[in-house]
Structures are given as C-alpha cells and as structure tokens.
Amino acid sequence: MFCLLLRRSAVHNSCKLISKQIAKPAFYTPHNALHTTIPRRHGEFEWQDPKSTDEIVNITYVDKDGKRTKVQGKVGDNVLYLAHRHGIEMEGACEASLACTTCHVYVQHDYLQKLKEAEEQEDDLLDMAPFLRENSRLGCQILLDKSMEGMELELPKATRNFYVDGHKPKPH
C-alpha cells in the first residue's frame, strides 16, 4: 500500500505530489498526512450504557405538561444529550456551545447546591431566557455525578427557538 503526500498550492489552487511512500502505521505517518475518522454524533457518551451499577444516576424530567419521565443516566452524562437519548423534548439548538437557552431547565432547590456554580457566560444567557427563575440552569452545562441521584429537572413552558415552523426537537 502506498501513501501519497500532497501539498496544496494557494496560488494555483492545485495539489502537487511531494512523495510516494510505503504506508506505515498511523503513529509513524508524517504530520501532514491525511487521516480520517468515523463521524460521531454530538452527545455520543450519553448514548452509551453505564459500565457498572456504581456509575448509574437516576433523574426525572418533568415536561411542560407535567408528564414525569424517569431516566437512568451515568456519571458524566450531559443532561441535554441524555434527554435527547430518551426522547425528551429539550431542543438544544446550539448543540451545547453556550449560544442559546433552548435547554433551559429548573433544578430542584435541594440539588442546586450540588451543581457546579454557573459560569458568567451561562448566567448571561439565562438572563435572556423566558420564564427565568432562581433555580434556572442550562441543561447543556449540567454533568451528572452521584450526588445528583434522584434529581428532578422541570422544563419551562416555552423557550426561544422552540417549535419554530412546527419543528419538533430530535437528537443531532
């Protein structure tokens, strides 16, 4: 098998063959060689099952109609992507890049102190969220740990960007 090394010319918008080599294992290849990877969806970690019972964290989502959905997550799961895995209607339009408030949730007061303190960027976004409460957080910024066992997350009645043109949120 051969490995072709190409250099792209910015001037002529073309590629020039630099050398032809026998392919070597990935850790021996030059830095400018082309590598490809398998595409991954956002929240890939959340789509994996817990490896042991020690990792399991049980939480409950309460949707805008009051329907309660108990979910079994694991330590390190992102609350937004975990909701997507279990078909809970939490949009997450910016895909956890801290650019919207569509994953806005209300955290039970008992569990608020167990969460990491919100960073300034999250607080700034929450200021723009409709139906803001003192226990409001962005779901994309909450990572589960064992201290959150039994936590309840309530979804607000509406968020900005939600159901635009009849859109129903789906995992990305």
From Swiss-Prot:
Its cofactor is [2Fe-2S] cluster. Disruption phenotype: RNAi-mediated knockdown in the whole body or in the prothoracic gland results in delayed or absent pupariation. GO terms for molecular function: 2 iron, 2 sulfur cluster binding; electron transfer activity; metal ion binding. GO terms for cellular component: mitochondrial matrix; mitochondrion. Keywords: 2Fe-2S, Electron transport, Iron, Iron-sulfur, Lipid metabolism, Metal-binding, Mitochondrion, Steroid metabolism, Steroidogenesis, Transit peptide, Transport. Its main location: mitochondrion. This is Adrenodoxin-like protein 1, mitochondrial. It comes from Drosophila melanogaster. The gene is Fdx1.
